[in-house]
Amino acid sequence: MKKRMLVCLLMMLLAVFSVAAAEETRIPVAENDRLALSLSVDLCGFEVLDKQTGVTWSSSMNDPTFTGKLAGLNQKKANSLLTVNVTNLVKGAGSITNAVLLNESQLGASYDLVENGVILHYDLATTGVALDVEVLLEDESVLVRVPYERINCYADFSIVSIDMMPYLCAGSDNADGFLFY
């Protein structure tokens, strides 16, 4: 009986610890009557909680069920908010390079809180591209934009395309929701 009681107490402590650890990896950003937006501490992803249903949407595949199924660059792509595809204008080779946030060795990342959301500032120094991403709560929606005037290509590279939230995940298979580009 004592062993069973000890195991139950340990399981309760582990559950409390894992919830506390999960909360430490997110920064609360904005909230309205329906949604709550939080940012990952590495500034490369966010989560949106639907307060009415309890469902959480994530901008990345941070679900433990995916652990080990992807490796290397694919894992970093799956957990990055965006991938910037660039080409070298000086070399003129026409080849496209993927600049993945979590693969960027010289990533400069910061954020500013704004009304109803956050502006993420990224500087991908390896490719010489800096850009801002706005994530805002508007009523029952999440608006994600990369304003043209906040893109700066300061080296030999130019942006070909931006893959925004390539692996946006719903909280469960039966959760309603839409994604528009």
Task: Give the location of each predicted region.
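Sec-dependent N-terminal signal peptides of Gram-positive bacterial secreted proteins and lipoproteins
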Residues: 4-22
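N-terminal accessory beta-strand-rich subdomains and adjacent acidic, glycine-rich linkers
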Residues: 23-181
